[in-house]
Every structure is written in structure tokens, then in C-alpha cells.
Amino acid sequence: MRIQDSSTIDIVAAAIIVYNDQGFVKSGYGHYEYDDDGNIVREVKDNKSMISEMIVSGRTFTDEELKAANELSDSINGKMMLKKLTGQLNNFEANVVKALSEAPNNFAVSIIASLPHSIAVDKKREAVNDRMAQLKHSSQFFGEKGNRYDINVEIVDVKYIQTSSVYMITGVYAGKDIV
């Protein structure tokens, strides 16, 4: 079967299956895993390639897999519709809307391949934001300017800031102070 002959829901179902199996591997970042002797143990392909192979092979999906795909698609469409109405769609989100609403093609597969990971990242980000919103009311400044402290903190979030090539690490000290 060709990608063009499949349905968008089949591609979403394949994306969920691949993500659940191997997490998210960006296009072009496939690799080999080796054992201690240097022998190839397995090839890890990027998600887009795995999804394309699954669709082209004619894989059929269970009712449960299709239900999960429909739920993910409906959830994303709902969020994107609200953003579209308020004029707040970024370029990626506009491509998501296009990929989910038009006939499947290779570009749509590449966009849909990232959706399960994007949803997982959004859920994590929401949880971190909720926690930070709660903590900002109890968080207090401690220490003196110019001094160093050796403290134990709980790491809550690590973000890579691409424009600065640095990591922003957010932690919590004593369960109440944001560091």
C-alpha cells in the first residue's frame, strides 16, 4: 500500500505504536545499537521511516489502536481549532492542521510522526507550570549575594535554550523554594 492510499487515522495509529515502542527518534537520527563486543544488536530507525514501513507493508490496526488514534487526532484538532480562531497558530501547528485534514503524503507522515512526542512534552510542560504556579507563592529568597551554597534540590525541569546554547535547570529546595 502507498502512503497516499492510506488514511490519516492509520498514520496516527502507526505513530502512536512506534512512539510507544521506541520513543521519538527525529528524521535522520536513526542509529545502530551495539553490544559490548561491537556487534550490531539492533537498528533504530527514525519514527517517520518506521511509520512509512508499517503503512506500506499493509499493516492493519486493531479497534483499540484506531480508537487511540481517533482520540489523539480529535484532541489535537480541538486545541488547534481554538488557536486558529484566536490567530495564535505557529508554523508547526499550521502544518499539523494541514497534515491531519488533507490526504496523506510523506510530509504529513513526518509531521504526524512527532505528534505523540509533542503531546507528551506538552503534558510534562503543563505539570511543571502547575507546580511552579503553586510554588511561586511560598518560594523565598535565601542566602547572600556572592556566596556559594551546597544544597540538595529536586530537579523539576531541564530545558535546552537553543538560541543561547545553554540548559535552564529548574529545581526546588526544601519542597518550597524555586532554585
What are these model-derived regions, one by one?
Residues 3-7, 17-127:
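Long, charge-rich alpha-helical interaction segments
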